[in-house]
Amino acid sequence: TMQVETDDFAAQCAQAFRNVVAVLGAAGASGEHLVRLTWYITSRDEYSASLRDVGRSYRDIVGRHFPAMAVVIVAGLVEPRAKVEIEAMAVVPD
């Protein structure tokens, strides 16, 4: 089971990036194969306040590949402590 280990928005984003990269790696892919990211966030204010740290961890973990992205503000996520969930779509060549 996946548990949220921190209430820090930027740290939750970094963990989400590590999770995405791990799944990509299991498929023989990397960040360059990402074509779309949809972020579900619970707080516009925390997102805005954390942009610099989130951007830095994205580049460090995923790389300097920037697919199409959308950010959706939601009332809540399944895990009560979660502040961000990232849905990723990748295209991996045969």
Segments and roles (model prediction):
Residues 1-94:
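Short, polar/acidic, helix-capping and beta-turn segments at strand->helix junctions
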